[in-house]
């Protein structure tokens, strides 16, 4: 298999900055498509993490933003294809906006320790947003698949701006018809131990302590509104199985039908200038552990 390409972004393609988030980023137009370039901070692995998780999602059949490795003026990063087209009257409504609109007292501006960001509140907001039960079930099932993906790759940054609904306004005769669907999963840079140095990765592999590492991280979704820290992504799925089995169990059964090797093979085509062999071995071991834990939860 050929290596994943590295898209070279040209300055004349830039069409505007993106204010959301903490990292330098901008929109550019390539062949009539809107892409978001996100610069990877030195030594963080944010670029390869985004690419690998996008490929893991593709193999697992989970809807996720299309991501390519990219470079701009010698600065490494990744490029994410826009899934909300303003030319088609499409708008992304972020989770914090949804929760603030349907959960009493929810603070959409709270950036850290937002303990009201719970599975229960997410489910409540979605059920109030969509009057038809079939639509509610479809949205919640899709979100459950995203949370299973988070657990598989150790994504600890599923905060309330990192999921949402794409709304489209269509003019029909004398009325405006609104359609809404779950946005593809996006923003997976905080995954797969990307923040570790290779020395630390090697030590974890040598000690066989990958499970301890996988269970150490705290996510951005909370189990209870009184908790001080978000729940670990693996533990969140366990909570979901107990609280919302109709959504989480099918997501786990779906994952169980995906061969582990296919998920692991997603790292093979990352160029070594972006991801070392030690890092690739670590990521494979990480997913071996999380896949085993998750598939054991499936009936």
Listing of model-derived features with the role each one plays in the protein:
Residues 46-47, 141-142, 276:
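Aromatic-acidic/polar surface patches that form glycan- and anion
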Residues 119-197:
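Conserved kinase catalytic-core segment
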Residues 61, 154-157, 293-298:
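Short helix-capping/linker segments at secondary-structure and domain boundaries
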Residues 170-299:
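C-terminal catalytic region of ATP-dependent kinase domains
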Residues 1-110:
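Conserved ATP-binding subdomain of kinase catalytic cores across diverse folds
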Residues 42, 51-59, 141, 145-149, ...:
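A broad, structural surface signal
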Residues 86-147, 270:
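ATP-dependent phospho-/nucleotidyl transfer catalytic cores
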Residues 66-74, 159-169, 299:
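Short alpha-helical "patches" and their helix-cap loops
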């Amino acid at each position: 298999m050929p290596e994943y390409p590295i898209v070279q972004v040209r300055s004349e393609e830039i069409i505007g900055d993106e204010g959301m988030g903490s990292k330098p980023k901008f929109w550019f137009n390539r062949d009539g498509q809107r892409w978001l370039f996100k610069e990877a901070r030195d030594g963080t692995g944010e670029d390869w993490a985004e690419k690998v998780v996008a490929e893991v999602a593709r193999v697992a059949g989970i809807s996720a933003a299309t991501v390519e490795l990219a470079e701009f003026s010698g600065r490494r990063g990744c490029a994410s294809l826009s899934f909300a087209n303003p030319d088609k009257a499409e708008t992304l409504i972020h989770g914090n906006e949804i929760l603030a609109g349907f959960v009493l007292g929810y603070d959409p501006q709270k950036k850290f320790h937002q303990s009201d960001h719970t599975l229960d509140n997410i489910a409540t907001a979605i059920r109030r947003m969509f009057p038809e039960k079939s639509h509610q079930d479809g949205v919640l099932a899709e979100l459950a698949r995203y949370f299973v993906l988070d657990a598989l790759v150790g994504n600890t940054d599923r905060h309330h701006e990192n999921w949402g609904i794409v709304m489209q306004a269509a003019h029909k005769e004398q009325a405006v018809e609104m359609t809404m669907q779950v946005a593809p999963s996006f923003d997976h840079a905080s995954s797969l131990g990307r923040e570790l140095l290779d020395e630390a990765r090697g030590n974890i592999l040598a000690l066989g302590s990958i499970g301890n590492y996988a269970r150490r991280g705290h996510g951005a979704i909370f189990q209870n509104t009184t908790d001080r820290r978000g729940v670990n992504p693996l533990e969140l799925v366990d909570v979901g199985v107990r609280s919302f089995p109709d959504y989480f169990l099918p997501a786990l059964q779906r994952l169980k039908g995906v061969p582990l090797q296919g998920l692991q093979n997603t790292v093979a085509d990352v160029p070594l200038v972006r991801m070392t062999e030690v890092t690739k071995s670590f990521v494979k071991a990480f997913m071996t552990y999380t896949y085993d834990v998750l598939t054991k939860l499936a009936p």
